[in-house]
Curated annotation (Swiss-Prot):
InterPro entries: Trm112-like. It comes from Pseudomonas fluorescens (strain SBW25). One of its GO terms (cellular component) is cytosol. Disulfide bonds: none annotated. It holds the Pfam family Trm112p. Belongs to the UPF0434 family. This is UPF0434 protein PFLU_3771.
Length: 61
């Protein structure tokens, strides 16, 4: 995924910023507490496809 997209993409639920996960397989929304998958370089920004962040992930800076 092109990291330049992070400057223009926002969480569709809370409209907050997104952060690329360390392994570059998900976009993380701390505001919504969700992780959106990246498949074949394309972020899947659907709430139904996102996973809920764990408590540790929510607290991790």
């Amino acid at each position: 995924m092109d990291t330049k997209l992070l400057d223009i993409l926002a969480c569709p639920i809370c409209k907050g910023p997104l952060k690329l996960s360390a392994d570059k397989t998900e976009l993380i929304s701390k505001g919504a507490g969700l992780a959106y998958p990246i498949r074949d370089g394309i972020p899947v920004m659907l709430e139904s496809e996102a996973r809920t962040l764990t408590t540790d992930e929510r607290l991790d800076k």
